[in-house]
Amino acid sequence: MNSLAITDSLLLVVTFLIAIGAKYPPSIRIAAGLFAAAACLGVLRFTGVLPLPTMHSFFSGLGATAAYPLLAVTFLFSGSVLANQWRFSSIFAVIAGALGLVASALEFGIWGNAVALISVAALVLRSIISRDVLATVGAVSLLTAVVLFALNVSFASLLKPGDFLHLFMALGLGLLGLRARVKMA
């Protein structure tokens, strides 16, 4: 089993637990569900059980264009209907995902990266301004994940760029999930 399968498995566990957690707002659960779908397909791909790179890429793209903005909404507008009602969270995810698909079809490849980066940067700024240490560490972890992956950083032959993405996303989403759960309680 290669390192990508292991790190994607960790991301799958974290995102799946958030997605099924009844104490989380719908917006973070939908975002986590999209990330979990990509991670599940990544595990299947990287273990060789079901190598479907296009499906993994598709759901990763949905994560970038729909899940990251939805995650930002969870914290930027935590009291809104968009963050707290399934109907509006779902509509937002579908529209954001559709925009991502259109951008992909038009070969506007930077769209997904730009949306993810802007969403995560907004999370970082909001967390710093509100002096929320847990959310800040989580948001900075997500920012680290996006930046290291975009820069194609690897560590010798041990960790590939995707490994850093998976590890820092798992850490960031876990911490942000914990923060969202604490706020809801």
Feature names for model-found ranges:
Residues 1-57, 185:
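N-terminal topogenic module of multi-pass integral membrane proteins
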Residues 8, 29-39, 90-94, 113, ...:
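Residues within membrane-spanning alpha-helices of integral membrane proteins
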Residues 8-20, 64-79, 118-125, 166-183:
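Hydrophobic cores of alpha-helical transmembrane segments in multi-pass inner/ER membrane proteins
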Residues 24-35, 81-92, 130-141, 185:
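Membrane-interfacial loop-to-transmembrane alpha-helix junctions, especially the N-terminal start
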Residues 36-44, 93-105, 140-153:
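Aromatic-anchored segments of alpha-helical transmembrane domains
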Residues 50-54, 101-112, 153-160:
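Membrane-interface helix caps and helix-loop-helix hairpins in membrane proteins
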Residues 57-126:
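Membrane-proximal helix-loop-helix units in multi-pass membrane proteins
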Residues 129-185:
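C-terminal transmembrane-bundle signature of multipass membrane proteins
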